[in-house]
From Swiss-Prot:
Protein species of origin: Toxoplasma gondii
The reaction(s) this protein catalyses: 5-O-(1-carboxyvinyl)-3-phosphoshikimate = chorismate + phosphate; FMNH2 + NADP(+) = FMN + NADPH + 2 H(+)
Pathway(s) the chain acts in: Metabolic intermediate biosynthesis; chorismate biosynthesis; chorismate from D-erythrose 4-phosphate and phosphoenolpyruvate: step 7/7
Region of interest called Disordered, as start-end residue ranges on this chain: 37-59, 344-377
A GO biological process held by the record: aromatic amino acid family biosynthetic process
HAMAP family: Chorismate_synth (MF_00300)
One cellular component (GO) term of this entry: cytosol
Family according to the record: Belongs to the chorismate synthase family.
Cofactor(s) of this protein: FMNH2
Protein name: Chorismate synthase
Molecular function as annotated in GO: chorismate synthase activity; FMN binding
Amino acid sequence: MSSYGAALRIHTFGESHGSAVGCIIDGLPPRLPLSVEDVQPQLNRRRPGQGPLSTQRREKDRVNILSGVEDGYTLGTPLAMLVWNEDRRPQEYHALATVPRPGHGDFTYHAKYHIHAKSGGGRSSARETLARVAAGAVVEKWLGMHYGTSFTAWVCQVGDVSVPRSLRRKWERQPPTRQDVDRLGVVRVSPDGTTFLDANNRLYDERGEELVEEEDKARRRLLFGVDNPTPGETVIETRCPCPSTAVRMAVKINQTRSLGDSIGGCISGAIVRPPLGLGEPCFDKVEAELAKAMMSLPATKGFEIGQGFASVTLRGSEHNDRFIPFERASCSFSESAASTIKHERDGCSAATLSRERASDGRTTSRHEEEVERGRERIQRDTLHVTGVDQQNGNSEDSVRYTSKSEASITRLSGNAASGGAPVCRIPLGEGVRIRCGSNNAGGTLAGITSGENIFFRVAFKPVSSIGLEQETADFAGEMNQLAVKGRHDPCVLPRAPPLVESMAALVIGDLCLRQRAREGPHPLLVLPQHSGCPSC
């Protein structure tokens, strides 16, 4: 079907070369501030024609909000969004009316429906994912405002080129930000195509090997402008936050494209600060829902969470995530956990706040104004923020408490003004007192979120529509030589992170509403982030 979700339901519609593509979101809470500007950035990251290594289909992908929003706030009614297809060329696919493309859905769609969309694959085209990204952007804003949850995905492998394992393991604990992914993954190519420049201004030859001779580096650096790109220079978005690996990926994709072929790879995804307790035993476990969502994306062929398939080489004593006291786990936090509300009243507890709630679930304490804003006040006198390691692209964004007495768990939820429950802070002495000291499980235990970051990987196969001539049979069983025309990505990976982020947001959003239906006025629990320390 074309719908996903139980409490938060998403429906998408439209074909690749039809008039438009769109989505309907049903179940979204009311009073969420929302505008086109909240959705468009993610669509821009997914948009075709971003560079020479993606499809040259030119689409503006400007989103239109048709219903469900008034005066800048959601109404709680179905929210509909639409994007018009402007660069349609169905005539390029006439030859495919009788010859199904190898690896594509032409044959199976025809077998199922006894008809298939000949132009670009119809619903099986990656164009359909535009609607998912639009829906995911909306849900992502709601989750960010109410729970501080964020989503990041990045390219970790293209063909046999992958991010170093040591860096991958570090990102599992402290993922790169979306800004890091976009900035550090940029690769510039000289007009003659012989020299590559990464985000750290390091130079590479046409094979992706870093230049070491100073004379050669000085000569080739003249090929690039200092402040503005040189005429004829090419900018490639790889969305790999390791600059040196990004260059090798760009070289690999460029080589594949020149052959008229395609190549696949893997996307790593991270859900930072997911609420604790999400997931429904036994068939709607959080990893089962994520796997279903990711495997519903076009071209996906594999999914793993935590250590995944690598866990088969470990013993239980190595793979188990042992629990540790919260004080030891809270020595350092990511920037997403920097915002905290501090109730100045001595001995503030969940029970105390609960007694003060009125029948509508609102808090009647003297901190009501702060709570209702749904914004957590930053305790800048107790925080220390570090930056990003520019050399290897590793995200070092972290916020560390200078006093252990400040370490605590936070209960976060939507505020009353935005259709949710209030926000409160719980001292360490009450509620959850332990957390996982490691995260081999990837943020879930028995299919329920543990409060730790959820990290996973998604494998994408090579694009099936390629320019190389292939010998294949038509629907009548006659052999033909087929070279697919049209505009297609030689590798979908650079445009795939927004897809993965959006599907993850739709899964977590649906599970949050399902858990809230069970919990009633009680806010969901969210743990602050820790990046590990010697004592842990």
